[in-house]
Curated annotation (Swiss-Prot):
It comes from the Viruses. Keywords: Host cell junction, Host-virus interaction, Hydrolase, Inhibition of host innate immune response by virus, Protease, Serine protease, Suppressor of RNA silencing, Transport, Viral immunoevasion, Viral movement protein. The record marks Y308, S309, G765, G766 as: Cleavage. Residues 168-308 form the Peptidase S30 domain. A motif (Involved in interaction with stylet and aphid transmission) lies at residues 361-364. It comes from Soybean mosaic virus (strain N) (SMV). A motif (Involved in virions binding and aphid transmission) lies at residues 617-619. The active site is at H221, E230, S262, C651, H724. Its EC number is 3.4.21.-, 3.4.22.45. Belongs to the potyviridae P3N-PIPO polyprotein family. Pfam families: Peptidase_C6, Peptidase_S30, Potyvirid-P3. This is P3N-PIPO polyprotein. InterPro entries: HC-pro, HC_PRO_CPD_dom, HC_PRO_CPD_sf, Pept_S30_P1_potyvir, Potyvirid-P3. One of its GO terms (cellular component) is host cell plasmodesma.
Length: 992
């Protein structure tokens, strides 16, 4: 580019060269051409228009349905009657409507409308403001004469009686009723009685014999009475034709008549009548010299007659079966099959009969009278002597299923108090004393002297006297004021306890290992329900952390993998210590001012705490023994090479498993069933040591041999107020205190109310966590009907958790969960159904009040009623104990608040209740919002499905985009993938 200098400034000159334009044309490819893409706004408008059309159609259908519903006269009448009908209870604690007539319902509806109109008129000022002149009706004080009547206010005139005109019956023949009765009897087989002269009765029924329907008389020889003429023809001939009128005879020969045919009636249509009697009727009695005998004729020599009543065996079986079928057991849990022969059944029936009612002949009246005239003591001696005389037979009978219980019942009921000398000594020491305590001792001694013969009233009186003595003794106990910790020493025994069950050679195999026998087979009830299998191939890491309600503990199960390097092996012997607590008052237990050493923590010689050490794990063992070296017992060999660990909250099952070692083999089934069906449902997860000790005491009552059973080592965590029952997987966490109790008998001392100890309230876990789980399950299920039905069927007491908040009660009432609970439980358990009815009534009262504190006051007032009903309900559901504790808290809080108010103080927890209610409302609102959004999503899905069904399809790219948006929306709101049931990660929107 050229420049021009003007002075000192350089100015550029533009280029004057002009370039020529090119005439070449560039070709345009198909890819570069524009495409026609449908507008997204048009698609959305189409969807919106189709959605509006469908909504309009739906609203129009609802309007037509409502019009048809309102125009249906029958339905409106029923609704009107049900609206004004009152609710009344039935005899079976149910509820029903006491329906009014249509006129009564209309009258009530008119009265309500009239009252409402009057109120509206009054509020709108539609009334006349004027004065009314009149005379007041006052009684005159002046006495004047007058007539006095004797009619009271209850007098009513006697109504005139209307004479009823009875319709004249149609003229029928005199035998009409007789024929109708006999016709019914021939069809149903009912018994008919004819009363003849002098009060004599003749019984007739129709039976099927020899392929025919024949009349049958009840003859005296069938009841054991033998007379010359069993039926008098002169007194029965009048109704014999009518009896035969409804019989259906067939060709029956004389040879066909046999035992069981006594009393059969034949007329002249049968050859039996024409060939064997001169009378027009023949009633079978038997045979004499091969010829049939007529019961209507007189027979001189009755000894020659072979009577054709049923044989004695059939008669006996008929009576036995009749009573046997009337007295079946009340429990039916299977379908009966024929597993034994009739001979074996007869032996069993005879053995039971002769054990309770020993006679030489059941048909002998003197044998029965002999037992009848015996006194109770003589009868017991008679049974004992009879049992002693037939000892060998009893040894054989005991092999029959259930006969040993019969023998035990007899031995128990006939046992006598063998320690009469001791009872007489008590009488000698207490006689001539009239003080209350001596009289109570005398009443108790009288009941003990009688033994099994004591009556229920005497036992009740003795129990009351023993309770009174116990209360008196407790009130007079004194405690020492000496400083316990200065002198407290509780050294661990250096010697191991001796367990006779582990020393008996009969219970050990050739290797010296304990043989479980039947105990091992029945122990499956523990392992199947409360233990989980440890699979080594999946690793042990998920079992290392053992959580409890207030903390956690590490198991040494990981040390089952042994390193071959010495240095690493030595590192596996080092534990992880918790904060070591010194000996405090929470470590000791006292009763009557004295230490109860088995219920205290172990100390060294100088009084310092003995801390737990690392416990190495083992495979498939039960580890017992708290003093000395532990004892390792192989687990029952039911499933080879399987390892089990107790589920969280059920580690106390190791105590019951250790007790099973000492249980007799024939009682192992009863022991394991009682633990599974009675003990564990009441204890639940993480029970207190007080409850565990009480459960152990209940088991020792039925199985006394378990009192000296050795316990697994129990570690005490004072920081978390928890006790850990150590199993074969040991403990990597160290530094806990150690409980000294070594046997079940020592552990039972925790169950005493007199024991002063903090440790008996420690958890073997915690109730608060269980309660929070129940509340969360209830809140998340209110708007999910399927989950709520599962809760109502399996664990109905969770609904009592709704008492923590009036809002939860109101939402459950609106969702009609209480009505559903009544429907499910009214036929199963009335007590549970009654809980739902009271919850519904309480919610109606709570909803009528808007003040939170007054609503909570209503709930507290109803808690005692809930508690009384809950006592009668089944205790199997897991939430029973949690619900009971919640009601107990309300009852105790109400009592304490009432006492504070009486003393002039005020409850300061008002703001706490309001904050707690707000938190629950947030949870409920979140659930409601989620449900509403789900409804909208499903609604849009339905619209899209309708569009695709009717042919309005979209291109693939648009469909994929909609599916992707819908999936993201579900993930961020529901945290759940709509395609698969697997949980998705929570979605977070990207920042814009």
């Amino acid at each position: 580019m050229a420049t021009i200098m003007i002075g000192s400034m350089a100015i550029s000159v533009p280029n004057t060269h002009v370039s020529c334009a090119s005439n070449s044309v560039m070709p345009v490819q198909a890819v570069q051409m524009a495409k026609q893409v449908p507008s997204a706004r048009g698609v959305l408008y189409t969807l919106k228009r189709e959605g509006s059309t469908q909504v309009h159609k739906h609203e129009e259908a609802l309007r037509k349905f409502q019009e048809a519903f309102d125009q249906d006269v029958g339905i409106q009448r029923r609704l009107l009657v049900n609206k004004h009908s009152s609710i009344q209870s039935t005899k079976k604690n149910g509820l029903t409507l006491r329906r009014l007539t249509l006129e009564q319902a209309r009258a009530k509806e008119a009265a309500i409308a009239r009252r409402k109109q009057e109120e509206e008129d009054f509020l709108n000022g539609k009334y006349e403001q004027q004065f009314y002149a009149g005379v007041s009706a006052t009684k005159s004080m002046k006495f004047e004469g007058g007539s006095v009547g004797f009619r009271t206010k209850y007098w009513r005139p006697t109504p005139k009686k209307t004479k009823e005109r009875r319709a004249t019956s149609q003229c029928r023949k005199p035998t009409y009723v007789l024929e109708e009765v006999l016709s019914i009897a021939s069809k149903s087989g009912k018994l008919v009685e004819f009363i003849t002269g002098k009060g004599k009765r003749v019984k007739v029924c129709y039976v099927r014999k020899h392929g025919a329907i024949l009349p049958k008389f009840s003859l005296p020889h069938e009841e054991g009475k033998y007379i010359h003429q069993e039926l008098q023809y002169a007194s029965t001939y009048e109704f014999l034709p009518y009896i035969c009128m409804f019989a259906k005879y067939k060709s029956i020969n004389a040879d066909d008549i046999t035992y069981g045919d006594s009393g059969l009636l034949f007329d002249e249509r049968s050859s039996l009548t024409t060939n064997h009697t001169k009378l027009p009727y023949f009633v079978v009695r038997g045979r004499r010299n091969g010829k049939l005998v007529n019961a209507l004729e007189v027979v001189e020599n009755m000894e020659d007659i072979q009577h054709y009543s049923q044989n004695p065996e059939a008669q006996f079986f008929r009576g036995w079966k009749k009573v046997f079928d009337k007295m079946p057991p009340h429990v039916e849990n299977h379908e009966c099959t024929t597993d034994f022969t009739n001979e074996q059944c007869g032996e069993l029936a005879a053995a039971i009969s002769q054990s309770i009612f020993p006679v030489k002949k059941l048909s002998c009246k003197q044998c029965r009278q002999h037992i009848k005239h015996l006194s109770w003591e003589e009868y017991k001696q008679f049974l004992l002597a009879h049992m002693g005389c037939h000892g060998p037979e009893w040894e054989t009978f005991q092999e029959i299923d259930g006969m040993r219980y019969v023998k035990r019942v007899i031995e128990t009921s006939t046992a006598e108090n063998a320690s009469l000398q001791t009872s007489l000594e008590i009488v000698r020491l207490t006689q001539n004393y009239k003080s209350t305590h001596m009289l109570q001792i005398q009443d108790i001694n009288k009941a003990l002297m009688k033994g099994p013969s004591v009556t229920q009233s005497e036992l009740e009186q003795a129990s009351k006297q023993l309770l009174a003595m116990t209360q008196w003794w407790k009130n007079h106990m004194t405690l020492t004021d000496e400083d316990a910790l200065k002198v407290f020493r509780n050294k661990r025994s250096s010697k191991a306890l001796l367990n006779p069950s582990l020393l008996c050679d009969n219970q050990l195999d050739k290797n010296g290992n304990f043989v479980w026998g039947e105990r091992g087979r029945h122990s499956k009830r523990f392992f199947a329900n409360y233990f989980e299998e440890v699979v080594p191939s999946e690793g042990y890491s998920k079992y290392v952390i053992r959580k409890n309600p207030n903390g956690q503990r590490e198991l040494a199960i990981g040390s089952l993998i042994v390193p071959l390097d010495f240095e690493r092996a030595r590192m596996a012997l080092q534990g992880k210590s918790v904060t070591r607590e010194p000996i405090t008052m929470s470590c000791i237990s006292r009763q009557d001012g004295n230490f109860v050493y088995p219920c205290c923590c172990v100390t060294h010689d100088d009084g310092k705490a003995f801390y737990s050490e690392l416990r190495s794990p083992t495979k498939r063992h039960l580890v017992i023994g708290t003093s000395g070296d532990p004892k390792y017992i192989d687990l029952p060999a039911t499933d080879a090479d399987r390892m089990y660990i107790a589920k969280e909250g059920f580690c106390y099952l190791n105590i019951f498993l250790a007790m099973l070692v000492n249980v007799n083999e024939d009682e192992a089934k009863d022991f394991t069933k009682m633990v599974r069906d009675v003990i564990v449902p009441r204890l639940g997860k993480w029970p207190t040591m007080l409850d565990v000790a009480t459960a152990a005491y209940m088991l020792t009552v039925f199985h006394p041999e378990t009192r000296n059973a050795e316990l697994p080592r129990i570690l005490v965590d004072h920081a978390c107020q928890t006790m850990h029952v150590i199993d074969s997987f040991g403990s990597l966490t160290v530094g806990y205190h150690v409980l000294k109790a070594g046997t079940v008998n020592q552990l039972i001392q925790f169950a005493s109310n007199d024991l002063q100890s903090e440790m008996k309230f420690y958890r073997v876990g915690g109730e608060v966590q269980q309660r929070m789980k129940c509340e969360t399950a209830l809140i998340t299920s209110i708007f999910k009907p399927k989950r709520m039905i599962q809760i109502l069927e399996n664990d109905p007491y969770i609904l009592l958790m709704g008492l923590v908040s009036p809002s939860i009660l109101i939402h459950m009432y609106r969702m009609k969960h209480f009505e559903k609970g009544v429907e499910l439980w009214i036929s199963k358990e009335h007590s549970v159904a009654k809980i739902f009815i009271i919850l519904e009534q309480l919610t109606k009262r709570v909803a009528a009040n808007d003040v939170l504190l007054e609503q909570l006051e209503m709930i507290s007032e109803t808690s005692e009623r809930f508690m009384s009903i809950l006592e009668d309900c089944p205790q199997a559901p897991h939430s029973y104990k949690t619900a009971k504790d919640l009601l107990t808290m309300y009852i105790e809080r109400k009592a304490s608040n009432n006492q504070l108010v009486e003393n002039g103080f005020v409850d300061m927890n008002d703001k706490l209740y309001m904050a707690y209610e707000k938190n629950l409302l947030r949870s409920l609102e979140a659930g409601m919002a989620r449900i509403k959004l789900v409804g909208k999503i499903f609604y849009n899905m339905a619209i899209e499905k309708i569009c695709s069904t009717y042919g309005e399809m979209f291109d693939k790219e648009s469909c994929r985009r909609k599916q992707r948006i819908f999936r993201k929306l579900c993930e961020c709101v529901l945290h759940e993938c709509p395609v698969t049931p697997k949980k998705c990660k929570k979605y977070t929107f990207p920042k814009m």
